[in-house]
Amino acid sequence: MPKTERRRDRDRDRDRERRNRRKRDDSYDDYDEEGGISGWKLGLVFGVIVVCFAMLYPTLFHPMLMGFLGRSPPSSPSINQQRPPIHPAMGGGSGQRHPGGGADVHPAMRMAQAQAESQSGGSKGMFTWMLPVYTIGVVLFLLYTLFKSKGKKSKRKKRNYFDSEDDDDESESETKYGGKFGKKKLEGLQKRLRETESAMSKILEQLESVQAGANPVDLDAADKRSEQLEEDPSVKEAVGLTETNEQYIKDLEVALKEFQSLSKEYDKAKMKKLKRKDSSSDEDEEDEEENSSELSEIEEEEEEVKPVKKSKSSSQSVGKRKNRPKSTSEEEDEGEEESRKVAEDAEEEGIDIDSEIREHAEKEKKDKNVRRRRPKKT
């Protein structure tokens, strides 16, 4: 039960990590699709910067450039707005005065005019100082966003690369060992694998030597030796055995016992195969001898039949010649006819003999097949 719960917890953690990675990848993809900053935003920022420079150039940048170049800006001529006083004879004695005259204006009015002028000048100065600060801030923001977009792209590539490597490592470790292992555990497993490989190589060498029969191993002596080692720990210390060495020795003993049992079974199977081969070879030899004897008997019978038939045909021809004392021409014609008949009879009789031989050979083959199909005696 605890193993299954641990596996479930691990699976849940892995699913969560994968979901978080997918969300990050989706956010980065959206950011890349937008291109960091869209085109209309960039156009808006550049337009604002151009307008700011156009507004500040005549009041701020142009005088600064002229000052750097050593040229003084042209001074605007001051216009005196105060009019000269009107002569009393011109009708100015009625008390009409110009408002610009400093002597006739009330002191409170003068203070209000001065305050208004100072406020207008202060507002203009603040506006002229805020515009360059605003432009500089916009430029810095633009540069910051550009560098940030590039940095995010590079970081995303690195993260994807390392995430892929981590996924590969995790999958390999999980598939091989069924869980997550640290570097120390992996190194320990590698060392154990090397030790097992060396032990297996030694086992194979000993098995080859046992198979060759050069160095036979006495299992009884090995069992006694192992019992002595288990009983006396001092003997172990004297020999220099450890737990790992004991395990290797036990594994070797078990492997040797199994090998001996397998070799015995293999020898038994070999003996059975040899016996079967010998019995089958003996039966084949007997069948061949029988067939050869039957064929020799058939040939002898054929040889005996042929001379008997020839003697019969010759005796018949001689008797006929004796019984017929005729003319030479008639005798010759009759002899030719008789010889033809004898040849035809002999040919017919020979064909019958061949057919009998074939039938006999077919019967023998059938008998052989029947014998081979019968179960062999072990």
UniProtKB/Swiss-Prot annotation:
<feature type="transmembrane region" description="Helical">
    <location>
        <begin position="42"/>
        <end position="62"/>
    </location>
</feature>
<dbReference type="GO" id="GO:0044183">
    <property type="term" value="F:protein folding chaperone"/>
</dbReference>
<feature type="region of interest" description="Sufficient for function in acetylcholine receptor folding">
    <location>
        <begin position="35"/>
        <end position="152"/>
    </location>
</feature>
<feature type="region of interest" description="Disordered">
    <location>
        <begin position="74"/>
        <end position="105"/>
    </location>
</feature>
<comment type="function">
    <text>Required for maturation and cell surface expression of acetylcholine receptors.</text>
</comment>
<keyword id="KW-1133">Transmembrane helix</keyword>
<feature type="compositionally biased region" description="Acidic residues">
    <location>
        <begin position="345"/>
        <end position="354"/>
    </location>
</feature>
<feature type="compositionally biased region" description="Basic and acidic residues">
    <location>
        <begin position="1"/>
        <end position="26"/>
    </location>
</feature>
<feature type="region of interest" description="Disordered">
    <location>
        <begin position="155"/>
        <end position="179"/>
    </location>
</feature>
<feature type="region of interest" description="Disordered">
    <location>
        <begin position="207"/>
        <end position="246"/>
    </location>
</feature>
<keyword id="KW-0472">Membrane</keyword>
<feature type="compositionally biased region" description="Gly residues">
    <location>
        <begin position="90"/>
        <end position="103"/>
    </location>
</feature>
<feature type="transmembrane region" description="Helical">
    <location>
        <begin position="127"/>
        <end position="147"/>
    </location>
</feature>
<dbReference type="GO" id="GO:0043025">
    <property type="term" value="C:neuronal cell body"/>
</dbReference>
<dbReference type="GO" id="GO:0007271">
    <property type="term" value="P:synaptic transmission, cholinergic"/>
</dbReference>
<dbReference type="InterPro" id="IPR032763">
    <property type="entry name" value="RIC3_N"/>
</dbReference>
<feature type="coiled-coil region">
    <location>
        <begin position="180"/>
        <end position="212"/>
    </location>
</feature>
<dbReference type="Pfam" id="PF15361">
    <property type="entry name" value="RIC3"/>
</dbReference>
<feature type="region of interest" description="Disordered">
    <location>
        <begin position="267"/>
        <end position="378"/>
    </location>
</feature>
<dbReference type="InterPro" id="IPR026160">
    <property type="entry name" value="Ric3"/>
</dbReference>
<keyword id="KW-0175">Coiled coil</keyword>
<dbReference type="GO" id="GO:0043005">
    <property type="term" value="C:neuron projection"/>
</dbReference>
<protein>
    <recommendedName>
        <fullName>Resistance to inhibitors of cholinesterase protein 3</fullName>
    </recommendedName>
</protein>
<dbReference type="GO" id="GO:0045202">
    <property type="term" value="C:synapse"/>
</dbReference>
<keyword id="KW-0812">Transmembrane</keyword>
<dbReference type="GO" id="GO:0032224">
    <property type="term" value="P:positive regulation of synaptic transmission, cholinergic"/>
</dbReference>
<feature type="compositionally biased region" description="Acidic residues">
    <location>
        <begin position="163"/>
        <end position="172"/>
    </location>
</feature>
<dbReference type="GO" id="GO:0005789">
    <property type="term" value="C:endoplasmic reticulum membrane"/>
</dbReference>
<feature type="compositionally biased region" description="Basic and acidic residues">
    <location>
        <begin position="355"/>
        <end position="367"/>
    </location>
</feature>
<keyword id="KW-0256">Endoplasmic reticulum</keyword>
<feature type="region of interest" description="Disordered">
    <location>
        <begin position="1"/>
        <end position="32"/>
    </location>
</feature>
<dbReference type="GO" id="GO:0005783">
    <property type="term" value="C:endoplasmic reticulum"/>
</dbReference>
<feature type="compositionally biased region" description="Basic residues">
    <location>
        <begin position="368"/>
        <end position="378"/>
    </location>
</feature>
<comment type="similarity">
    <text>Belongs to the ric-3 family.</text>
</comment>
<comment type="subunit">
    <text>Interacts with the deg-3/des-2 acetylcholine receptor.</text>
</comment>
<dbReference type="GO" id="GO:0006937">
    <property type="term" value="P:regulation of muscle contraction"/>
</dbReference>
<feature type="compositionally biased region" description="Acidic residues">
    <location>
        <begin position="281"/>
        <end position="304"/>
    </location>
</feature>
<dbReference type="GO" id="GO:0034394">
    <property type="term" value="P:protein localization to cell surface"/>
</dbReference>
<dbReference type="GO" id="GO:0043231">
    <property type="term" value="C:intracellular membrane-bounded organelle"/>
</dbReference>
